[in-house]
Every structure is written in C-alpha cells, then in structure tokens.
Amino acid sequence: PRILSSAASDVYKRQLLFTPEVDAKIHDSFIHSRIGLKKPAYVFNEKFDFIDYVYKENKKRVSCILVDEAQFLTSEQVKQLCRICDEKNIPIMCYGIRTDFRGELFPGSLALLSLADNIIELKTICEYPSCSRKATMIARYDKDGEIVLEGNQIDIGADKYKVYCRKHYRLSLIHI
C-alpha cells in the first residue's frame, strides 16, 4: 500500500486510516508500506459501521479517509463509504487487490469496481523468472510449495502468495 507522503499529510490534516481485522493481527494495527514506512490505523471487521464512526469523528473535521486491504470490505461498507464521500465531501482512497487465488473477485473489490468514481491500477510485474508482463493473477502455495486451488478465500500471509501474468498463472496450473 502507498502511505500518504508528508506533503499529502499537510494537505489532509485529519486523516482516518483503516485496516481490516484479518490483516491487523499480523501488523499490530499499522499500515505498512513496502519501503518500510508505517502508520497507525483503525481496525475494521465485517460488522464495522463506517457511517457511525466517521460522522462522530467528523466533529474533528476529517479531511481524508484511506482504507488499506479494501478487498476485505463488505459491499454494504463500500456503500457506506460512498455515502460519506457524497454527503461529507471527504476524499476516500481504497487500496487492495481485485481477485483471490482462484481468480474470483472479492466482494469488496466487486463493490468498489462498481461504485468507485475513479480507479487507478497499481501495476506489478509477473514473478515468473524472466517474465516482464503485467501481473494480473495471484497464486497461493501451501507449506510444501504446491499451488493451492481450494480452500478459504482468505489465508493471511504474504509468503504464501505469488503474482503472475495470466499466461504463467495458467501454466503453473497445468503442472498440478
């Protein structure tokens, strides 16, 4: 995830940062960037009501909301964030992935793709050796290094996943 820079922090005086409960257990309620920056974040779960929380906090003039790992939002929570954006004119930035290891959309991602005013794709490169294509697929591996095709949609741990272009994802499935 991209952490707001100090320049953005100056513009957005009162930021509310959110991270999902499933990720917070690993990261101690902080949002971590790949370059080592970290910021404290409020933790949400599937029952969290963004409207109640933000409307109470807006007495302190919230100027920006950032949601990390937004694929873990429910579709109702995405609608709540849209309402906050529309009614309070608060910019909301959501960061997350589109699909799971089976190539299926997360419910939060589906809702965001349907309702977002603007979508910016942050590109990454396929992890297959010597490939330079854009990564669009996520593969999950078990402890023995074997690719997994079944199981819970959520299994936290970056060491269990690799990103591939569609071609190399498909080829990795053939070897099973």
Where do the PLM segments sit?
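Single conserved hydrophobic/aromatic residue that forms the stacking wall/gate
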Residues: 1-8, 12, 174-175
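Walker B beta-strand of ABC/ABC-like P-loop ATPase nucleotide-binding domains
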Residues: 65-66
